Every structure is written in structure tokens, then in C-alpha cells.
A protein has these predicted regions:
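N-terminal subdomain of nucleotide-sugar transferases
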Residues: 1-39, 51, 214-216
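Short donor-sugar binding/catalytic loops of nucleotide-sugar-dependent glycosyltransferases
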Residues: 10-14, 195-200, 214, 228-231
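Nucleotide-sugar donor phosphate/pyrophosphate-binding loop at the beta->alpha transition
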Residues: 17-18, 66, 70-73, 108-110, ...
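Conserved nucleotide-sugar phosphate-binding/catalytic loop shared by glycosyltransferases and other
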Residues: 28-67
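Donor nucleotide-sugar binding/catalytic pocket of nucleotide-sugar-dependent glycosyltransferases
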Residues: 54, 135-180, 191
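Short His-centered aromatic/hydrophobic patch
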Residues: 89-95, 113
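Conserved donor-binding/catalytic core segment of Leloir-type glycosyltransferases
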Residues: 184-202, 207-212, 223-224
């Protein structure tokens, strides 16, 4: 399929919410777009755009050598079957195992580093292993995209991205579909809103402790959290 593109990601909701415009632009240019991502409820929306869906199952978090090897072999099989013009990967596991599969099959590929993840941020032996895997997986990438300069500088310093790199403007909200609205009346409350993933590594426990301390001294305060629960 010379005009097909293969998209690899770990989140159907993230792909639809933040990269929908990319998918639509590729489709409008005449490409056949196949998407490999676990189904958590957004696949029908992705298919409605005109994308082909490839059922995919893997754990977003954690490292299991056997399961991760199966994922890499699954990606390699997809690339041999679809023979895409190029592969675009998002998020850590698709970046690493999709990148390795692309190298093994000689498929051109582009990588989007959407974040470093707690493993790279925390250091230690596991960090060294991930860095080595990134170096191998990204070595032949046509381009490595980053969401911010900090991630780019870290990966370049660690020699994970030695070729063409770009910092993209961001993956923001489509303000045509999501129009700003007036903030609701607060009734005299002081409101704190945290937009975050509900994970220990992201500081949820510290936030809850701080909220309790502040609320005990200032009952007029209200703390709200917007985000997905992940652990």
C-alpha cells in the first residue's frame, strides 16, 4: 500500500483529542491512514474520521520483556503486511518498539516524544536501560518531534536523538470545537483547579495533603481536580 500511513499510539483518547487534526489532514491529502492503538472507547470516533483501525492490546505502563517483545513482533508484522509509506509513532512503547520494528523492516518512520515518563525522570539502572533502547529505536528515524525544548535537550544530551529533531508548537485544544465559556459563579469560594493525571508520580498525594491543610484553615476554599485516574 504505497499511499498508506501507519500510526502507532498507546491511547485512543489521546490520539483523537490531541492529534485528530493531524489524522484529518493526512486523510485530506489522500493517504490511507491505519491506526494501531488499544480500544478504550474512542476507536469508533477515529474510524468515523476515515481511518482504518487495527485491534491492538498492550499495557501502557510497566515493563515485561516477554509482552514487550510480542508487541515489537506485532508491529513488525503490521509493517510487513501494510507496507506503509511511513510510520508515525506516539508515546513511549510505540516509539521504542515501533521504532525497532521499523528499523527491522526498513520502513521509514517518524517519532513524536510526547513526554519523558517517570522512568527517565527518576534515574537509576532502569533509566539507563530505557535510554539504550531509545538510542537503538530512534537511530534511523526520519525526524524526532518533541513537545518542548526541555524534553528535546534531555534526549539530545543522552544521545537518544542524534538526527533531525523538531520542537512542535504543541498539541493544544481546538478552540473552534471547544469554545471558551464564562466561569461559573463561585459563591464567594476561593477555587483551586488542578489539571493532571491522578498518579503518585505526578504528585496527587502531595496535592491532597496540601488541600486538606489549606481547607482546614480556610473552609471557604474549594479544590477541584480534572484528569484521568490511572492508579
Amino acid at each position: 500500500m504505497a499511499s498508506s500511513l501507519l500510526i502507532l499510539s498507546n491511547s485512543d483518547s489521546g490520539l483523537y483529542d490531541f492529534r485528530k487534526e493531524v489524522l484529518k489532514a493526512l486523510l485530506e491529502k489522500g493517504f490511507r491512514v491505519a491506526v494501531s492503538v488499544p480500544d478504550t472507547g474512542y476507536v469508533d470516533k477515529i474510524k468515523a474520521l476515515g481511518c482504518d483501525y487495527i485491534p491492538t492490546s498492550f499495557e501502557r505502563r510497566g515493563m515485561n520483556p516477554v509482552k514487550d517483545m510480542k508487541l515489537m513482533l506485532f508491529y513488525r508484522r503490521l509493517m510487513k503486511e501494510y507496507r506503509p509509506l511511513a510510520v508515525l509513532t506516539y508515546t513511549i512503547k510505540p516509539n521504542i518498539y515501533g521504532g525497532l520494528a521499523a528499523r527491522l523492516t526498513g520502513t521509514p518512520y517518524l517519532v513524536n516524544v510526547t513526554g519523558l515518563g517517570t522512568t527517565l525522570e527518576n534515574g537509576g539502572l532502569l533509566q539507563k536501560m530505557i535510554i539504550l533502547m531509545y538510542r537503538t529505536a530512534l537511530k534511523k528515524a526520519g525526524c524526532v518531534f518533541f513537545q518542548n525544548k526541555g524534553n528535546r535537550d534531555f534526549m539530545v544530551q543522552k544521545k537518544c536523538a542524534s538526527g533531525k529533531v523538531r520542537v512542535i508548537p504543541g498539541s493544544g485544544v481546538n478552540l473552534t470545537e471547544h469554545r471558551p465559556e464564562e466561569y461559573p459563579e463561585d459563591g464567594g469560594q476561593i477555587r483551586f483547579v488542578s489539571v493532571m493525571r491522578l498518579m503518585k508520580d505526578k504528585g496527587i498525594e502531595e496535592l491532597l495533603a496540601a488541600a486538606q491543610t489549606v481547607h482546614e484553615k480556610h473552609p471557604e476554599t474549594l479544590f477541584q481536580i480534572l484528569g484521568a485516574y490511572e492508579e
